[in-house]
UniProtKB/Swiss-Prot annotation:
Belongs to the GlnE family. Its cofactor is Mg(2+). Residues 449-946 are annotated as: Adenylyl transferase. It catalyses: [glutamine synthetase]-O(4)-(5'-adenylyl)-L-tyrosine + phosphate = [glutamine synthetase]-L-tyrosine + ADP; [glutamine synthetase]-L-tyrosine + ATP = [glutamine synthetase]-O(4)-(5'-adenylyl)-L-tyrosine + diphosphate. Involved in the regulation of glutamine synthetase GlnA, a key enzyme in the process to assimilate ammonia. When cellular nitrogen levels are high, the C-terminal adenylyl transferase (AT) inactivates GlnA by covalent transfer of an adenylyl group from ATP to specific tyrosine residue of GlnA, thus reducing its activity. Conversely, when nitrogen levels are low, the N-terminal adenylyl removase (AR) activates GlnA by removing the adenylyl group by phosphorolysis, increasing its activity. GO terms for cellular component: cytosol. Its EC number is 2.7.7.89, 2.7.7.42. Keywords: ATP-binding, Magnesium, Multifunctional enzyme, Nucleotide-binding, Nucleotidyltransferase, Transferase. It comes from the Bacteria. Residues 1-440 are annotated as: Adenylyl removase. It comes from Shigella boydii serotype 4 (strain Sb227). One of its GO terms (biological process) is regulation of glutamine family amino acid metabolic process. InterPro entries: GlnE (IPR023057), GlnE_rpt_dom (IPR005190), NT_sf (IPR043519), PII_UdlTrfase/GS_AdlTrfase (IPR013546). This is Bifunctional glutamine synthetase adenylyltransferase/adenylyl-removing enzyme.
């Protein structure tokens, strides 16, 4: 065994001072001193349990001792009689065995492959033991779940990721998917439960047993987000539901994840074989599938962007040449050829890598370099995590932990270790780029003329700039030179390292050459330099623009077209990553795919890290807004589609925010008990105004109200029991908080809940019955107008149907025409007096006479006036389709409806484009005169003369 290095020998004295007397007095072996010096986790554990150290000294860890884990744990659980006892014993067993694994790993008593096997088998043993104990307990409590033939149904657990592959980290969370075979109900219990309810409740208890922190710690952090539909999907699915999902909706990234899926525990039973056979066709295609390369390339791009966003420098998992790239290399061959080559269908990386070499898919040299690099990186990762039992892949910056790792990895010092690490990661990166790297060869632009470099370096006299700036006016030339000079002065005020200066000196001549070729060079340069000032200390973003000429080109064209986009990029430079791929930049997410894209995006963030979750939501929204705006500018999205995309994006955000708030509230209080025997959450979010009418703009806020169907006597079922209606109030407050909290990425949306019954004076969340009663007996006409543009944007089917029925009933009430006309007209006149244009000789597109609001009032009036006779008028909540309905139902002549639709979309289009230019929503008084005259005539016809 290698002696401790000098820094570690000094640290040993600190360790001695921490040890209790029985250990301090004891003559510790050299092995014990080494491990206690290396790992604070082992130190803390043996201080709390000195007998573990005695056991380690007398029974040194062996490579094959994982075979005894199940028997050892069974003995530990033999006297457990309740869930609290189960939780305690599982935690103590996990910690004891992890100390043994850390001991063996630190001293290199066993191979790294054996360490990975032990870590994975320990997790599986604990998961299966907890499941089996809880299954028996739940069957005693609720009866045994059976299928139609009366056969008992088990809970099957898929271990995903490294757990499934038998390659678990030292300190890792576990990704699981729960499934049961067939529908049916319980037998032998006090009352019948269907299997879905039984397994959902059992699954919740299993997660609690493994995941909930106690004074003994936790067993594993459990992540269930890889299941179908993610957090919004059922916790446990039947085989049939799983099969339907993966056949109909399974995404490429889910196929990638499923490669490593392994059934925990008895994997040879009938049901296990059935589940495995069902999933295999989804993962391994019968044909050779080269489309997977682009999918994996896209996923790697997402990871690279995440590394930049979160500043994950020195990350041996996600960085270039890291563990993830080796995994991608191996899985590319599995996904492309696994359907034809059964030998590639292994879940574990190293055996699969050997098969890849044997099939000559990679050269023996490349495969061997990857194998050696993988074992090196995994040992480094596990040692790093075993210092504090902490889930990290980022190399330490402090001297002590660097000395620890250098010693444990058998290097003289930190520079020697990092030198070897760099060599391994360089080898991995080379193979990765050859296989999965961008398929377009990066061509170097022709070298720029020396004059552009001199212009940037301020080496040109003003007269010398004439050739490169000759096409610009004298004023623009002076402005460009001033902007360059001012930018250089700003740089002098900032701390930019040598690498940053080097990248800037390469980037700026290219940038100036492209910008100054434009007629609007001065304006564009002013926007871009404002952005660059914000990122000059973040070299990775400068490198992005320097190394990807296409990204620089898109940056220039978008900043030239829209100061709003320039401002967004300056405020949130992480959006620069979106410029890398024009296929996605100018092609917004499909309207029905926002929820799934967001779900995939959030999977990269720890579920229990609220701060990162909030940031991720905001970053996703900003990236999607950029793509929508880019497509808008490029003319590929008409105004109606812009609003559709903005609305679908908002709905995806609402879905995710409600999900996060729900998880947080249930963790604190439990669920309201009226939900125990039904699906869903008993909660709905209703969108009003632009959201309800599918008419959101770039900076629109969200008008929301919250409904629940909780009975008066309901209580929550958690340890901190509260009134059920109080639960929904706190849920709504939490939702508002998640939307409105300002992080470094800003707020998510401004949310206005004042359209709820009784406005700001009313309860934030309302029961469905109280909402219906208010609308029937207390609401004003303007509130019924608002209801025309309202719809459920999140909610259970029952609540959605209830709201739709109330809305339809209210809109179909018989109304006296003259009275309604007067009330609507007077409300509009009040609004105009309050909100109308205060700018002389300007037309406010939304608020002034002949503008958008007049059109909205016309449609609302006509729906309320005629829905009693024409119920079909209640179908839609957006103005364009309401105008279509008015024509189809012979309320309005088709010619007038089409003309109002054209006027409406024209005015909204102008508002979108003014927003992109960061201009207020008013224009010269002589603009849109034809549209305004048309709207005025229609207003006169319906709301004055009739």
């Amino acid at each position: 065994m290698k002696p401790l290095s000098s820094p570690l020998q000094q640290y040993w004295q600190t360790v001695v001072e921490r040890l209790p007397e029985p250990l301090a007095e004891k003559s510790l072996s050299a092995q014990a001193k080494s491990v206690l010096t290396f790992s604070d986790f082992v130190q803390d554990s043996v201080i709390a349990h000195p007998e573990w150290l005695t056991e380690l000294e007398s029974q040194s860890p062996q490579a094959d001792e994982w075979q005894h884990y199940a028997a050892w744990l069974q003995e530990a659980l033999s006297n457990v009689s309740d869930e609290a006892g189960l939780m305690r014993e599982l935690r103590l067993f996990r910690r004891r065995i992890m100390v043994r694994i850390a001991w063996a790993q630190t001293l290199a008593l066993v191979t790294e492959e054996s360490i990975l096997q032990q870590l994975s088998h320990l997790a599986e043993t604990l998961i299966v033991a907890a499941r089996d104990w809880l299954y028996d307990a739940c069957c005693r409590e609720w009866g045994t779940p059976c299928n139609a033939q009366g056969e008992a149904q088990p809970l099957l657990i898929l271990g995903m990721g490294k757990l499934g592959g038998g390659e678990l980290n030292f300190s890792s969370d576990i990704d699981l998917i729960f499934a049961w075979p067939e529908h049916g109900c319980t037998q032998g219990g006090r009352r019948e439960l269907d299997n879905a309810q039984f397994f959902t409740r059992m699954g919740q208890r299993l997660i609690k047993v493994l995941d909930q922190p106690t004074q003994d710690g936790f067993v594993y952090r459990v992540d269930m987000r890889l299941r179908p539909f993610g957090e919004s999907g059922p916790l446990v699915l039947s085989f049939a539901a799983l099969e339907d999902y993966y056949q109909e909706q399974g995404r490429d990234w889910e196929r990638y994840a499923m490669v490593k899926a392994r059934i925990m525990g008895d994997s040879e039973g009938v049901y296990a074989n059935e589940l495995r056979a069902m999933l295999r066709p989804f993962v391994f295609r019968r044909y050779i599938d080269f489309s997977v390369i682009q999918s994996l390339r896209n996923m790697k791009g997402m990871i690279a962007r995440e590394v930049r966003r979160r500043g994950l420098t020195d990350n041996i998992k996600l960085g270039a040449g890291g563990i993830r790239e080796i995994e991608f290399i191996v899985q590319v061959f599995q996904l492309i050829r696994g359907g034809r080559e059964p030998s590639l269908q292994s879940r574990s990386l190293l055996p699969t890598l050997s098969v890849i070499a044997a099939l000559h898919l990679l050269s023996e040299n490349d495969a061997e370099q990857l194998r050696v690099a993988y074992l090196f990186l995994r040992r480094l990762e596990n040692l790093l995590q075993s210092i504090n039992d902490e889930q990290t892949q980022t190399l330490p910056s402090d001297e002590l932990n660097r000395a620890r790792l250098a010693w444990a990895m058998d290097f003289a010092d930190w520079p020697q270790l990092t030198g070897a690490l760099t060599a391994h990661m360089t080898n991995v990166r080379r193979v990765f780029n050859e296989l999965i790297g961008d398929d377009e060869s990066e061509t170097q632009e022709e070298s720029l003329s020396e004059q552009w470099r001199e212009l940037w370096q301020d080496a040109l006299q003003e007269d010398d700039t004439t050739p490169v700036l000759a096409h610009l006016s004298e004023d623009d030339r002076k402005q460009v030179l001033t902007l360059i000079a001012d930018f250089r002065k700003e740089l002098d005020k900032r701390t930019i390292g040598p690498r940053g200066r080097q990248v800037l000196d390469h980037l700026m001549p290219h940038l100036l050459s492209d910008v100054c070729a434009r007629e609007d060079a001065a304006v564009t340069l002013s926007r871009i330099t404002a952005l660059l000032v914000g990122i000059v200390t973040r070299t990775t973003y400068l490198e992005l623009l320097s190394e990807f000429p296409a990204a620089l080109k898109h940056l220039i064209s978008l900043c030239a077209a829209s100061p709003m986009i320039a401002s967004q990029l300056a405020r949130y430079p992480l959006l620069l990553d979106e410029l890398l791929d024009p296929n996605t930049l100018y092609q917004p997410t499909a309207t029905d795919a926002y929820r799934d894209e967001l779900r995939q995006y959030l999977l990269r963030v720890p579920e229990d890290d609220e701060e990162q979750q909030l940031e991720a939501l905001r970053q996703f929204k900003q990236a999607q807004l950029l793509r929508i705006a880019a497509a808008d500018i490029a003319g590929t999205l008409p105004v109606m589609k812009v609003s559709d995309h903005l609305t679908w994006l908002a709905e995806a955000m609402i879905d995710a925010v409600v999900q996060q708030a729900w998880v947080q509230m249930v963790a604190r209080y439990g669920k309201p008990n009226h939900l125990n025997d039904r699906e869903g959450r008993g909660f709905a979010v209703v969108g009003y105004g632009k959201l309800g009418g599918w008419e959101l703009g770039y900076s629109s806020d969200l008008d929301l109200i919250f409904l629940h169907d909780c009975p008066m006597d309901a209580m929550t079922d958690g340890e901190r029991e509260i009134d059920g209606r109080q639960f929904y109030l706190r849920l709504a407050q939490r939702i508002m908080h998640l939307f409105n909290t300002r992080t470094s990425s800003g707020i998510l949306y401004e949310v206005d809940a004042r359209l709820r019954p009784s406005g700001a004076a009313g309860m934030l969340v309302t029961s469905a019955e109280a909402f219906a009663d208010y609308q029937k007996n207390e609401a004003w006409t303007w509130e019924h107008q608002a209801l025309v543009r309202a719809r459920v944007v999140y909610g259970d089917p029952q609540l959605t149907a209830h709201f739709d029925a109330v809305r339809r009933e209210i809109m179909m009430l018989p109304r006296e025409g003259k009275t309604l006309q007067t009330e609507v007209r007077e409300m509009r006149e009040k609004m105009r007096a309050h909100l109308g244009n205060k700018h002389r000789n300007r037309f406010d597109i939304k608020a002034d006479e002949g503008g958008i609001t007049d059109i909205e009032f016309i449609t609302q009036y006509l729906v309320l006036r005629y829905a009693h006779e024409k119920p079909k008028l209640t179908r839609w909540s957006d103005n364009v389709r309401i105008l279509e309905l008015l024509a189809q139902n012979d309320i309005m002549e088709e010619q007038e409806a089409m003309a109002l639709t054209r006027a409406y979309t024209t005015l909204r289009d102008e508002l979108h484009h003014l927003a992109l230019q960061e201009l207020p929503g008013h224009v010269s008084e002589d603009c849109f005169t034809a549209e305004r005259d048309l709207v005025r005539a229609s207003w006169q016809k319906w709301l004055v003369e009739e």
